[in-house]
Amino acid sequence: DRATRLVDQLLTLSRLDSLAQLDDVQQVAIADLLQSAVMEMYHPAQQSGIELRLHLNASHIVRTGQPLLLSLLVRNLLDNVVRYSPCCSQVDITLNAREFRVRDNGPGINPQALSRIGERFYRPPGQEAPGSGLGLSIGRRIASLHGMQVDFANARDGGFEARVYW
């Protein structure tokens, strides 16, 4: 339920904030990580009328990190796009040599709200879908712990895009 999810997110964020470095790191194949997340989110996406499309332009990318945290980063991005994209949207998840992107073909986000996306507890005005405003900030913190950065933007030809790069 919603309260349990909020408590889980707060605990996750608290744990991530206390980390100065990662322990128990290993080599993680980013293509495998993206494929697993797409498979996990496939059914919820279908229920919302959203098509997930995976494009592996660079399939042998490996990063050092904690697999569970990196998986959480990707799941949070996909959960966000499935939760907030309008019905009948297409979502492209694209892996390139130095980045991966999650992009929908919806209306994008108001420019004033866009500058605050990823802040803790921030939700754009008028948002009807349930959420806490923590998922993207958790993702941003996980990326930072792994030497990555996350940017959020409106795509040039429409839609919202999250870009994770290293």
Annotated model-derived regions:
Residues 147-148:
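Conserved glycine-rich
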Residues 135, 139:
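Short alpha-helical Gxxx[C/S/T] motif in the catalytic ATP-binding
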Residues 26-27, 46, 51-61:
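Conserved catalytic submotifs in the C-terminal HATPase_c
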Residues 109-121:
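Short conserved segment of the HATPase_c
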Residues 24-39:
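A conserved beta-strand-to-alpha-helix junction within the catalytic ATP-binding
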